[in-house]
Amino acid sequence: MKNNIRFDLSDYLIHFFRDVDLETGSHIYLPEHCGFNNQHHACFIDAKYLLRLSLRSHKIFSSWSYRNGQRTVYGDSPVVCFTDMPIAAYLETGVRRLERNENIGLYAIVLPKEQMFNYGARPVIYGLDEHNNARCSQGRYGERILDETALPLIEQYRYVTYVPGKIDWTHEREWRWPYRGDINNFLNHIKEYGIPENIESTPGFDFRSSEISGAGIIVPFAEDIPTVAHDILTLIDRGVIGRNTFKFIIAVESLQSWT
């Protein structure tokens, strides 16, 4: 559509990786062993490692976005989070927020928005009707469940609190993809041992089993390109993904301008 050709719109969804400290309340769940040549030996895990782990595992891992030890994603489905900011806008805000030591990263996987919509990704819902009550109950594994008269359970993964002047995440232009598979064994293993059993049982969007094409990678440095390209080519040689799954790699430092 001609009306969609605008500088503030994008045909892509961006999932970025940030540095993570496993000993904080904003952690992620990773198994002790993530497969051959994918070992992390410290509680601090850098964004480049997480990008390469996702590529080598052909999976973007789902989570409930823990903050201070509490889930921030409502409902019972873990999600993969994206922004639909145009790539140029993401690069600009990413550089500025990193300068302020905010939680963002310049390592990212870029997926075509229309294809991801067909796989179930949806824009989040910022706030509810003023007559609906957003109070929630807590489930066995820490789920935050809203009253279904306010929002059906199947849609609750999309809800993001919005209180003008106090809580405003609308600048993130967030989309989410919900994992709809069975997660009981995953949750039980975490409850008993504190970590997932293995990388295969960790929920996420598996681009091996999808027909995604035209995806891309963003890295901050040109020196990152050979290693990331190696990971992608290895997947192609193994027959895990197709030749057209990934089409580009952007190194931020090589761009003369993104405005």
Q: PLM ranges: what are they?
A:
Residues 1-259:
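NAD-dependent ADP-ribosyltransferases
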